[in-house]
Amino acid sequence: MFLALLYLALPLADVLLSAEVSGLPGGDRLDCVKASDQCLKEQSCSTKYRTLRQCVAGKESNFSRATGLEAKDECKSAMEALKQKSLYNCRCKRGMKKEKNCLRIYWSMYQSLQGNDLLEDSPYEPVNSRLSDIFRLAPIVSVEPVLSKGNNCLDAAKACNLNDTCKRFRSAYITPCTSSTSNEICNKRKCHKALRLFFDKVPPKHSYGMLFCSCRDVACTERRRQTIVPVCSYEDREKPNCLNLQESCKKNYICRSRLADFFTNCQPESRSVSSCLKENYADCLLAYSGLIGTVMTPNYIDSSSLSVAPWCDCSNSGNDIDECRKFLNFFQDNTCLKNAIQAFGNGTDVNVWQPILPVQTTTATTTTASRLKNTGSETTNNEIPTHNDSPACANLQAQKKRKSNESVDTELCLNENAIGKDNTPGVSTSHISSENSFALPTSFYPSTPLILMTIALSLFLFLSSSVVL
């Protein structure tokens, strides 16, 4: 009898599991604009929300002088009450119609719940795309360009001109980024805005094709470096201190959010197969491109490597020199980002067939500095392996080949560290395709509450049948 009841309970458990999977990570989660509107229509939520906004804005300061702990308790009470509302878990979408307003609402909540100095949690709804999805739509960045002897970045620019959307938005940023004004080289504000629109609106198969194209020679890499018109969008008369630039970025909702997204999705992890904590190259490249058009705009440092950095340095850092270097090194020596750029240029992706060992991570309440220290001693050698070693794409594919006993293709991974040494690409051992892979997402595995619910249901049915008998 018990086995029969268990047999009946299992389909129900499967339904519950499916519901949980479909609800993660976003499910019915609202964007912050809709969540705010919904909250303001409910009297109890509206009252708590208005109180919280006053707390965030600092308008409670005069009130707190009069009532002391009572004011703090009221802020805390409002915060706890809103944790039960959809506003608590709201997110925004990059390039959405009311993005800035959405981000303002998100940060008003986040600053109250977590503090004002954190950048780790991205306010954007996860996209969870794969490079392989882009490759299926983009012949120009597939295997053929890697083997060609032409200029891939030039080919990508030509492909952009053949696409109406890409051509329109590219022209829209070229004009303000190259038009000088009376006192300045260009109007940087208009240039930045147009660049953001380009990377937000143009399909990655075209925008990434110009920004992350693989190169064999300096002419190609220099064209890649010039993609964002750095003389206007990137360079300035003087380099500010990186920590000061970070503070300026945090004062702008768009910049702060894009930087948080970059820290979240390009976090290096030396123990992972891809050198990325999240094992997703596409999300890292999306986060990186999202910074372009903000005061934290990054670009390739020179024409001989994949190292990138914002326009800043660590001079005049004083006692904060270590923190400044960690911040700057997150850009310059980021193995995850470098591997992602190289993978896109090679037409490869993370091998999701390879089982990943669990990685212990820090919580969302760690500070930016403590999060960046993970890029220290464990990742001091962050350069992409030279042609004498197997680069990330070769290592990943070799693992897949060993599982299937297939031979390893030795032609399709291009290593840009060989640029300048000779006129042939560094040879690696393989080309990766994750098109047919089916690694299960983390959200697939049942949660503890769901397991307990299933067990309780089975036990209840068993006891009920016993009473009947």
Swiss-Prot record:
Belongs to the GDNFR family. This is GDNF family receptor alpha-1. Keywords: Cell membrane, Disulfide bond, Endosome, Glycoprotein, Golgi apparatus, GPI-anchor, Lipoprotein, Membrane, Receptor, Repeat, Signal. It is a lipid-anchor; GPI-anchor. Residues 1-27 form the signal peptide. A lipid is attached at S430 (GPI-anchor amidated serine). It comes from the Eukaryota. The keyword Glycoprotein applies. It comes from Gallus gallus.
